């Protein structure tokens, strides 16, 4: 298998590679390099002598050689068998005539026998089937009588009463304040104060005391971290004012 593959591959490569004569042109030989080709002369070949013994055991004596002479064959037990039919001429095989007038016939013969035409009978009666397919059956179309009558259309506009109720709710705001007890150790406490700006001022933000611990937000609610709890509300301010007024 491998040898066949390699031989086929070499044959395929040799088809696409140029031969030695196609690679480069050979230079002409000089006159003294090669001898001239010999002239053609017919040679006389002496006839070979006959074999000393033939394939037969009792071979006849060899006759003097004469060109074109074939020695006669002798019958022996080892010679080729003789067919008796070849000794007598063969006679032509006689064939009986078909009928009188052969080969000039009054009518030509057909190449094959054509029997009578057989008509297959259908399994059902052919008349209704033929009528159902080939004869058109008329289907009467139904007649439609259209009658028109006077019609009156009255339209009343609908009247609906809808009751509208409006409810108004006022927003209520609840403020819850818680007090953080102050312990002996200072702990950070948070206080949430809600302040409403006055009507005369335009700035809505309010900064509480203790600026280093103040966280400023954009909203009005601010978260402050300090050691002491300070609740800035109107109720506590009025309480301290009353206390200072009493003990002042």
Swiss-Prot record:
Q: In which tissues is it expressed?
A: Abundantly expressed in lacrimal gland where it found in the secretory endpieces. Also expressed at modest levels in the submandibular gland.
Cellular localisation:
Secreted
A GO BP term here is: regulation of sensory perception of pain
InterPro entries associated with the record = SMR-like
Q: What Pfam families does this protein map onto?
A: PROL5-SMR (PF15621)
For the region Disordered, what residue ranges are annotated?
Answer: 150-198
UniProt entry keywords in alphabetical sequence: Glycoprotein, Protease inhibitor, Pyrrolidone carboxylic acid, Secreted, Signal
Keyword RNA-binding on entry: no
Signal peptide location: 1-21
Q: Which Gene Ontology terms of cellular component type are present? A: extracellular region; extracellular space
One of the entry's Gene Ontology molecular-function terms is: peptidase inhibitor activity
Where do the record's glycosylation annotations fall on this chain? 218
User: Where is the PTM Pyrrolidone carboxylic acid found along the chain?
Assistant: 22
| Job of this protein | Opiorphin is an endogenous inhibitor of neprilysin and aminopeptidase N. Inhibits the breakdown of substance P, Mca-BK2 and Met-enkephalin by neprilysin in vitro with IC(50) values of 29 uM, 33 uM and 33 uM respectively. Inhibits the breakdown of Ala-pNA by aminopeptidase N in vitro with an IC(50) of 65 uM. Has a potent analgesic effect when administered to rats by intravenous injection.
Q: Which family does it belong to?
A: Belongs to the PROL1/PROL3 family.
Instruction: Please report the name of this protein according to its UniProt entry.
Output: Opiorphin prepropeptide
Source organism of this protein record: Homo sapiens (Human)
Which gene name does the record give?
OPRPN
């Amino acid at each position: 298998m491998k040898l066949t593959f390699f031989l086929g591959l070499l044959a395929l490569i040799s088809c696409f590679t140029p031969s030695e004569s196609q690679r480069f042109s050979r230079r002409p030989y000089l006159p003294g390099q090669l001898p001239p080709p010999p002239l053609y002369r017919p040679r006389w070949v002496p006839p070979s002598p006959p074999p000393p013994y033939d394939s037969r055991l009792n071979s006849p004596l060899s006759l003097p050689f004469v060109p074109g002479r074939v020695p006669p064959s002798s019958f022996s037990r080892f010679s080729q068998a003789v067919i008796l039919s070849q000794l007598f001429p063969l006679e032509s095989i006689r064939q009986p005539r078909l009928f009188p007038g052969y080969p000039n016939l009054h009518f030509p013969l057909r190449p094959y026998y054509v029997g009578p035409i057989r008509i297959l009978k259908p399994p059902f009666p052919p008349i209704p089937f033929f009528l159902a397919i080939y004869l058109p059956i008329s289907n009467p179309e139904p007649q439609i009588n259209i009658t028109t009558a006077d019609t009156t259309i009255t339209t009343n506009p609908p009247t609906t009463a809808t009751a509208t109720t409006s409810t108004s709710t006022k927003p209520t705001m609840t403020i819850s304040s818680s007090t953080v007890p102050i312990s002996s150790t200072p702990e950070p406490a948070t206080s949430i104060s809600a302040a409403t700006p006055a009507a005369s001022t335009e700035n809505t933000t309010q900064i509480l005391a203790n600026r280093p611990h103040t966280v400023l937000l954009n909203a009005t609610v601010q978260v402050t971290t300090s050691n002491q709890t300070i609740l800035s509300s109107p109720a506590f301010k009025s309480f301290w004012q009353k206390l200072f007024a009493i003990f002042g």
